[in-house]
C-alpha cells in the first residue's frame, strides 16, 4: 500500500449571528481540515474539537503533526484509535480515512458502515439563548422544523419563560432543551416539573461534567441525555443509572469509527442513542449522517448557523436532513 500524503489546514467559519449557550457565546467556529491522498484517491475530514476540554485548533493540529509519520504510513481506522486519543484530531483524520477507503473500494462510505441504504432523517433545529421574544420568533422562523432544541442558560425562571413562549409559538413540534451543564441537582426537580408542563421531551446535560453521581436515583419524567458527561466509548459505563440517552458527537469520541461502536454498546446497555455535532460545515455533518441512520434523536444542524457552507452541501428540507454521496464519502474521490 502506498504511503499517504497528509495535509492539515485550519479555517475560521463565520456565524450568521452569535450563538449563545450557558456560559459561552460563539461568533465564529474554528475547524481543522485534513486531506489524505495516495496519488489516486483522496479522503477529507473536518473537526471543530471540544471547546470545554480545551481541544482547540492548536491542540488538534499539534496532535496530528505529532502523529504525522504514523498517519502517512496508512493505518486502518482501528489502528488510528491507538495512535490518537478521542477528540477533534482523530475525528478529522478518521473521516479522511473513511472517505479514502470508500474511494479505493469503489463503494460509498455508508456501505462500508454496513448500511444497505440511507434515508433522510428528522433533525432538530436549535434556538440559541436570547430574550424570550427573540427565541420565540426564531422558533416561528423555523417554519419547516418538526423538531426544535432550545438552549438554556441555567436561569430557572427565564429558562421556563423561554420554553413557555416557544411552546406557545410552536405547539406542533417535538421539543427538547439543552442545559449545557447550567444547573445543579437542587434546582433540577423544579426545572423538570416546569419543562414537563410544556411537553418537553428531552433534557440534555442538566448538570456539569463531573457531577454525574448527583443524578443517581433521580427520578425524571423527562428523559435525560448525556452530552458533556460522556465523551467516548470508555465513559459509557459512567452513565448507567444516571441518563436515559447518550448524545454521540464525532468530535468528542474521535470519529465515525468509534461513534458506531458507541452506538452499538449504548443500545446494549439500554440507552437510547442520539447524534449531535459541533458547529461546522457539511463536511463535518456528513459522517454523522451515517451514524444518524441508527439514532432515535438527531441534532445535526451545525451548517445552518454559518454564513457560508462548503459545496456541495447537505440538504435541509421539511424538517429532514439528507447528505448525498457528493458531499463526502463517495465511491470515487480523485486526489
Please describe what each predicted stretch is.
Residues 1-175, 182-189, 193-197, 312-335:
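N-terminal capping/lid subdomain adjacent to the active-site entrance of alpha/beta enzymes
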Residues 303:
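Active-site cofactor/co-catalyst pockets and adjacent glycine-rich loops in catalytic enzymes
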Residues 296-299:
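Short helix/strand-capping turn motifs
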Residues 150, 155-293, 307-319:
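Catalytic core of soluble alpha/beta enzymes
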Amino acid at each position: 500500500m502506498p504511503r499517504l500524503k497528509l495535509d492539515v489546514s485550519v479555517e475560521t467559519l463565520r456565524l450568521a449571528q452569535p450563538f449563545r449557550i450557558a456560559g459561552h457565546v460563539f461568533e465564529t467556529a474554528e475547524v481543522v481540515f485534513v486531506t489524505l491522498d495516495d496519488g489516486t484517491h483522496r479522503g477529507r475530514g473536518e473537526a471543530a474539537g471540544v471547546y470545554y476540554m480545551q481541544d482547540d485548533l492548536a491542540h488538534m493540529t499539534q496532535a496530528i503533526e505529532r502523529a504525522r509519520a504514523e498517519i502517512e504510513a496508512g493505518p486502518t481506522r482501528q489502528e488510528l484509535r491507538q495512535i490518537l486519543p478521542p477528540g477533534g484530531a482523530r475525528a478529522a483524520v478518521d473521516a479522511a480515512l473513511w472517505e479514502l477507503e470508500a474511494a479505493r473500494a469503489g463503494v460509498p462510505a455508508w456501505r462500508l458502515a454496513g448500511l444497505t441504504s440511507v434515508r433522510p432523517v428528522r433533525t432538530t433545529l436549535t434556538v440559541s439563548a436570547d430574550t424570550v421574544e427573540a427565541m420565540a420568533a426564531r422558533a416561528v422562523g423555523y417554519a419547516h422544523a418538526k423538531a426544535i432544541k432550545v438552549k438554556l442558560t441555567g436561569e430557572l425562571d427565564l429558562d421556563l419563560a423561554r420554553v413557555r413562549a416557544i411552546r406557545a409559538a410552536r405547539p406542533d413540534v417535538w421539543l427538547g432543551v439543552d442545559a449545557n451543564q447550567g444547573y445543579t441537582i437542587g434546582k433540577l426537580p423544579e426545572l423538570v416539573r416546569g419543562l414537563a408542563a410544556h411537553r418537553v421531551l428531552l433534557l440534555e446535560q442538566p448538570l456539569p461534567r463531573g457531577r454525574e453521581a448527583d443524578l443517581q436515583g433521580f427520578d425524571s419524567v423527562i428523559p435525560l441525555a448525556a452530552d458533556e458527561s460522556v465523551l467516548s466509548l470508555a465513559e459509557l459505563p459512567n452513565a448507567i443509572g444516571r441518563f436515559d440517552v447518550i448524545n454521540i458527537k464525532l468530535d468528542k469520541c474521535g470519529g465515525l469509527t468509534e461513534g458506531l461502536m458507541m452506538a452499538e454498546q449504548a443500545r446494549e446497555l439500554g440507552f437510547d442513542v442520539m447524534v449531535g455535532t459541533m458547529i461546522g460545515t457539511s463536511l463535518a455533518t456528513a459522517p454523522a449522517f451515517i451514524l444518524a441512520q441508527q439514532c432515535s434523536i438527531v441534532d445535526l444542524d451545525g451548517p445552518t448557523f454559518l454564513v457560508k457552507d462548503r459545496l456541495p452541501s447537505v440538504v435541509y428540507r421539511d424538517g429532514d436532513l439528507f447528505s448525498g454521496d457528493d458531499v463526502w464519502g463517495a465511491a470515487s474521490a480523485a486526489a
